[in-house]
Amino acid sequence: MNHPQPITMPIPGHIDPVPVPRDLKPRVDGRIDLLGLSRDDLRMALETAQLEPRQAKLRAKQLWHWIYNRGATDFAVMTDIAKDMRGWLDQRFVVSRPEVVEAQVSTDGTRKWLLRSDDGQDYEMVFIPDADRGTLCVSSQVGCTLNCRFCHTGTMKLVRNLTPAEIVGQVMLARDALGEWPSQPEGRMLTNIVMMGMGEPLYNFDNVRDALKLVMDGDGLALSKRRITLSTAGVVPMMARAGEEIGVNLAVSLHAITKEVRDEIVPLNRKYGIEDLLQACADYPGANNARRITFEYVMLKDKNDRDEDALELVRLIRKYRLPAKVNLIPFNPWPGAPYECSDPDRVARFSDLIFKAGISAPVRTPRGRDIMAACGQLKSAAEKKSRAELDRMAAEKQAALG
């Protein structure tokens, strides 16, 4: 079989290549969005609006409960706050949600939302229901700088980082859609979060960290760090910091075990090689047999799926004494993709070789392929549909809501 010649991709740039200003900027209507603010920033926003410090502390506590525990977006429903104070808040502040441009449901129950920011940037999130859990796949950037050749998002240019409000807003919107307010630890559909949507989370470290701290706060969304996984293609200098400052589970987009192949399909490898990446995994704070590091490995026909590749992967995991499991991902096709998925028998053989070495290597069942929501298929629909068409859809949605 003839393969396309490898294309030399630019090596991704420095950390946080598109910084987002962290000062509070009013919306077009002059109001400040409270979503995404830390407790201290929420209190400071009230003080800046001339509320005296003692009042600001009390109101911040009440607002926190209504925003993150009850899911409120309207100050009028916050009944333990005096009516005149609710009016005062409504004049100065807002609790936002991302704009939903399009919502799709797969035949397997997977849901995908196309979202649009205030400045007109589009990004996607996906909810994957299972019998024992429900996982929300969250985006961290509009586009991506990594250029991974098997990934649809990698064909997009990086536009900008998502803000903490835009990241946590995806979780809030999913809770809205699932009817899961007030927040409660038992019986909810949204049980897990994976930072595996559009973008490289560690190239937007501060905003991802701040958003996940909101998600993990016990007085609000209250999702345990053990139910959150952050995926990186291998931004080695930021991995230890992620473990120390966020402390969630780590997944690594490995996908190849030779320099030649990984340089081609994950260009970041030319900056941070496999050996350095695996050492960073070995040093990751909190990794142990109860909290294993997940290695993601997309199965590409005649590219990375030989028996020798499986055995070398086992050798490397043992060499670095990594508490690890391997997720084997059948390649999910997208228009113009340069690869094909490995044959099912080859995937099964690859998995079996790793299992026989005592390392868990399940094959992930593709979910949401029919709506381009599966792993590696996300791409802003603004690049697949005309802006006029998207605007028309948004207008029709608004008209339907009255």
From Swiss-Prot:
Keywords: 4Fe-4S, Cytoplasm, Disulfide bond, Iron, Iron-sulfur, Metal-binding, Methyltransferase, rRNA processing, S-adenosyl-L-methionine, Transferase, tRNA processing. Its EC number is 2.1.1.192. Pfam families: Radical_SAM, RlmN_N. The keyword Transport does not apply. Its cofactor is [4Fe-4S] cluster. It is found in: Cytoplasm. The active site is at 124 (proton acceptor), 375 (s-methylcysteine intermediate). S-adenosyl-L-methionine binds at residues 199-200, 231, 253-255, 332. One of its GO terms (molecular function) is tRNA (adenine(37)-C2)-methyltransferase activity. It catalyses: adenosine(2503) in 23S rRNA + 2 reduced [2Fe-2S]-[ferredoxin] + 2 S-adenosyl-L-methionine = 2-methyladenosine(2503) in 23S rRNA + 5'-deoxyadenosine + L-methionine + 2 oxidized [2Fe-2S]-[ferredoxin] + S-adenosyl-L-homocysteine; adenosine(37) in tRNA + 2 reduced [2Fe-2S]-[ferredoxin] + 2 S-adenosyl-L-methionine = 2-methyladenosine(37) in tRNA + 5'-deoxyadenosine + L-methionine + 2 oxidized [2Fe-2S]-[ferredoxin] + S-adenosyl-L-homocysteine. Binds 1 [4Fe-4S] cluster. The cluster is coordinated with 3 cysteines and an exchangeable S-adenosyl-L-methionine. GO terms for cellular component: cytoplasm. Residues 130-370 form the Radical SAM core domain. Gene3D superfamilies: 1.10.150.530, Aldolase class I (3.20.20.70). One of its GO terms (biological process) is rRNA base methylation. Specifically methylates position 2 of adenine 2503 in 23S rRNA and position 2 of adenine 37 in tRNAs. m2A2503 modification seems to play a crucial role in the proofreading step occurring at the peptidyl transferase center and thus would serve to optimize ribosomal fidelity. Reaction proceeds by a ping-pong mechanism involving intermediate methylation of a conserved cysteine residue. This is Dual-specificity RNA methyltransferase RlmN.
